[in-house]
Amino acid sequence: MHSPENGPAHVVDALVIGAGQAGLATSYWLTRHGVEHQLLEQRPELGGAWQDRWDSFYLNTPNFGFLLPDLTYNGPEPDAFLPRDEVIGLFRDYAARIKAPVRLGTEVTRMVAVDGGFTVDTSQGRWQARNVVLANGAFQVPRVPPAAVELPGRILQLHSHDYRNPQQLPGGAVLVVGTGQSGGQITEDLLDAGRTVHLSVSTCPEAPRRYRGQDVFHWILQLNLRGPEYGLNGLQADQLPSPAARFMCNPLISGNGGGHGIHVRDLGRRGVRLHGRFEGTDDGDLVFSDDLPARLALVEAGFSQRLGRMADAYIAAAGIDAPPADPAPVDPWLPADSGERLNLDAAGITSVIWCTGYGLDFGFLDIPVLDAWNYPRHSRGVTEVPGLYAVGLPWLTKHLSATLSVVGDDAEFVASHIAGR
């Protein structure tokens, strides 16, 4: 082993930090361009962030959405969804097939720009490279609200990152905070196990699993890839209203059980106690915002006001013969008590699962290239620092840039740029 401080450095033309789907796609294209490179992966095994999903997890992307270079789905079930362990196995097989040069168990600790290149210190030695690709992904630092520290120590707190199944929780009721895809799906997992669940509702939009004759992801994917051909640029990164929008919620859908949309009011009908936004604690009570009816209405209207309209515009512009949209259901159901205050002991809550998203982690990067959101300043993945690139971040170039459907396109552009230096 080489010491980062004292040992001789490994030298390579291009270093790729991360060997998840972004890193592997980049490796594929670098190989095609004949660029010598090395991938560094801090995990002990391949499989990326999919290894952090719960046991019952299924991809939200249908099989037809596998569009990595030299990895597309050609089987009999294009509209089906793969479970977690099959996804992990698929990426391990892919890495072997493309002969990706990966060093596992290698954590990057510091990176600096030196003499027109970069010095990268890791847990397994020092590297020098003329080019570096940041491909360590968007699921790095679990975010938990500051008010989490107010909860008593007897309450088990887990982020969705660490949740695996209901059996790892103590007996008693569970509070799930957040209704993005993780929050909705974990709530269903707990319900199926017969657990009592309280749910703090966020503003992530619901969506139908199928829309106008296709899986809803079909239209989202077409808008990403072909929308600009018809002047429909709403899912292109340069059309975002603000930098914060790069971290907006994805539609509330699931690939479990053959795929379905998750309707928050339906969860309430099934016995989930719905609450507004979690705001903190007060004298042994959990405190929530008192706007649950407005939140539910906002959640339900989100798809039709944005993605649904975009899909309709694409269908019309492309001249696609698609069935009309089903009328949006009007659902007036509300819980008898929205529960702005909830006593932990009276409710029997013994655990909290924070489904509150992730932050980016570039703490190793000792180069002034990050914006106020810890996001690299770039154009199409090419940062303002010569030789430094990014692939696999949300909204890098498009809405789906961080997904296995589009990350290969961004990786191809970046690899071509590296080859041309």
Task: Kindly label every feature range from the protein language model.
Residues 45-72, 97, 267:
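Redox-cofactor-proximal catalytic regions of oxidoreductases
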Residues 2-43, 47-49, 79-421:
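Flavin (primarily FAD) cofactor-binding/catalytic cores of flavoenzymes
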Residues 74-78:
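A short acidic, helix-capping loop that chelates divalent metal ions and anchors anionic groups
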